């Protein structure tokens, strides 16, 4: 049974809650459980932000399919490759081979190693483009004397 949360009109939380695992990353106690967050943007194109840990994969895939409502999944944005963000990426790409993976070069190497030997669609992004700040030369900030 699906369990999703509406964040905005076109953004849904489709992750899952794990109340069984005693430790996060085998090191940090989580006596009340933990949440694996994944979000789906439903716009002209559909964009999935991260997958989840295998502990909640059944719930995640039920949530995803319900939220998509028969629409195709266009993009999967991979923030980084730790299991709480990407453990079910390989299974996702089997279910949705039409999706283009959006990631950086380091993540792509790990995807090829751990999940998909040859992802069909990949859009590489430069880490620097994702984390830029305005600078004085952009004209958005005053120049310092």
Where are these predicted regions, by residue range?
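Structured loop/turn residues at beta-strand edges in well-structured enzyme cores
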Residues: 9, 71, 117
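Active-site metal-binding motif and surrounding structural segment of the metallo-beta-lactamase
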Residues: 44, 55-102
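Conserved small/polar residues in nucleotide/adenosyl-binding loops
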Residues: 131-138
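Anionic-ligand anchoring segments at beta-strand to alpha-helix junctions in alpha/beta enzyme folds, i.e.
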Residues: 102-103, 107-112
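A short alpha->loop->secondary-structure connector
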Residues: 68, 118-121
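Short acidic-hydrophobic, aromatic-tinged amphipathic segments that line or gate anion-handling sites
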Residues: 121-127
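Conserved beta-strand hairpin/beta-sheet module of binuclear metal-dependent hydrolase folds
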Residues: 3-64
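Hydrophobic alpha-helical segments, chiefly the membrane-spanning helices
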Residues: 143-145
